[in-house]
Amino acid sequence: MEFPLAQICPQGSHEAPIPTFSTFQITDMTRRSCQNLGYTAASPQAPEAASNTGNAERAEEVPGEGSLFLQAETRAWFQKTQAHWLLQHGAAPAWFHGFITRREAERLLEPKPQGCYLVRFSESAVTFVLTYRSRTCCRHFLLAQLRDGRHVVLGEDSAHARLQDLLLHYTAHPLSPYGETLTEPLARQTPEPAGLSLRTEESNFGSKSQDPNPQYSPIIKQGQAPVPMQKEGAGEKEPSQLLRPKPPIPAKPQLPPEVYTIPVPRHRPAPRPKPSNPIYNEPDEPIAFYAMGRGSPGEAPSNIYVEVEDEGLPATLGHPVLRKSWSRPVPGGQNTGGSQLHSENSVIGQGPPLPHQPPPAWRHTLPHNLSRQVLQDRGQAWLPLGPPQ
């Protein structure tokens, strides 16, 4: 008000302290007082410019460095919390002047009679300011809003649901500590309050109340002409940029149906031909244990010498006859260490040469001139190592 908050007398007391300022100065005690009273008005960022009661015309309010930022906050606060009840059919009351400075408000009220008033936005806090013409100067009162939404003059007890009701109350009840009342409002000369676009504010508030869901950009199908989008309530405003459809995606080349129906033959390796002559044949009779090889067959030895007794000679010779037998290389035989096995038996007696008998068709890997029966009966086979003599 017109004195520091530290000089506010206890509520219920009508003793007025000596005024020292034409408008009260915001201090830390003011913030504590607002918290104790439950006010929701924002704390001021810069104090109202002070002036002496006798030199009101010399007071000049210098906006702080954050004035543009403060105006943006005030505009957002007004749109969210005050516009729905203050605006009537999209029009603001005549006594609300919006963003006008303290100096301009004093210039407008200077020629007016005592008690003439107006309401404006504060230059130091996010709230309203009541400015009226007193007997000697113009006085400025900050208006606060309680947690329940009621409006009060900062430092007063009377709280009201609407700002219009608060102004009407002080036309009949004086404002302490000076005992001055309000008489008539000062109507503004502009159709809208300064710094506010009521059409935009009302349309934004209406769109948010009707459609609380977030807005999404429409999807335009290919082949359809884009429809110009206009903002709700914009009226004569030009639409912003039109949405451009994306270029069509080139189609893939079509292939003949034969490509999909006829499978491509795959190259498969030819099976290996089976050998005409097998490596070995199954014998008709079992083979003796010492004649059976172990492991995989290696290279065949060049010669194998075996001496056997021949019982088919005539008995007139009187002595056994041994003959030298030369065997052919055995296919698939083993050759241990690359050495050749030779055997030779001395001839006890010489007899007439025996006729050559073809070997029987044996299906085994032993030499053809080896008598299996002799090996089985006598079980004697001398296989000496070393070259033949």
From Swiss-Prot:
Where does the record place the modification Phosphoserine?
S217, S296
Give UniProt keywords alphabetically.
Angiogenesis, Cytoplasm, Developmental protein, Differentiation, Phosphoprotein, SH2 domain, SH3-binding
**In what ranges is there compositional bias, type Polar residues?**
203-216, 337-348
Quick one: a GO biological-process term for this protein?
cell differentiation
Where does the record place Pro residues bias? 245-256, 352-361
Q: Where in the cell is it found?
A: Cytoplasm
Record's superkingdom?
Eukaryota
- Indicate the principal place this protein occupies in or around the cell: cytoplasm
Region (Disordered) spans which residues?
41-63, 190-295, 324-389
How is the polypeptide modified once translated?
Phosphorylated on tyrosine residues.
A GO cellular component annotation here is:
cytosol
Q: Where is this motif: SH3-binding?
A: 244-250, 272-278
Q: What tissue expression does the UniProt record report for this protein?
A: Expression limited to tissues of the immune system and, in particular, activated T-cells. Expressed in peripheral blood leukocytes, thymus and spleen. Much lower expression or undetectable, in brain, placenta, skeletal muscle, prostate, testis, ovary, small intestine, and colon. Expressed at low levels in unstimulated T-cells, but not expressed in normal resting or activated B-cells. According to PubMed:10692392, expression is not restricted to activated T-cells, but strongly expressed in blood cell lineages, the endothelium and other cell and tissue types, such as heart, lung, and liver.
One annotated GO molecular function: SH3 domain binding
- Induction of synthesis: Rapidly induced after activation of T-cells. However, the gene continues to be expressed in long-term cultures of activated T-cells.
Q: Which residues form the SH2 domain?
A: 95-186
Q: Which CDD domains match?
A: SH2_SH2D2A (cd10416)
State what this protein does: Could be a T-cell-specific adapter protein involved in the control of T-cell activation. May play a role in the CD4-p56-LCK-dependent signal transduction pathway. Could also play an important role in normal and pathological angiogenesis. Could be an adapter protein that facilitates and regulates interaction of KDR with effector proteins important to endothelial cell survival and proliferation.
Subunit structure of this entry?
Interacts with KDR. Interacts with TXK and ITK.
Designated name of the protein: SH2 domain-containing protein 2A
Source organism per entry reads: Homo sapiens
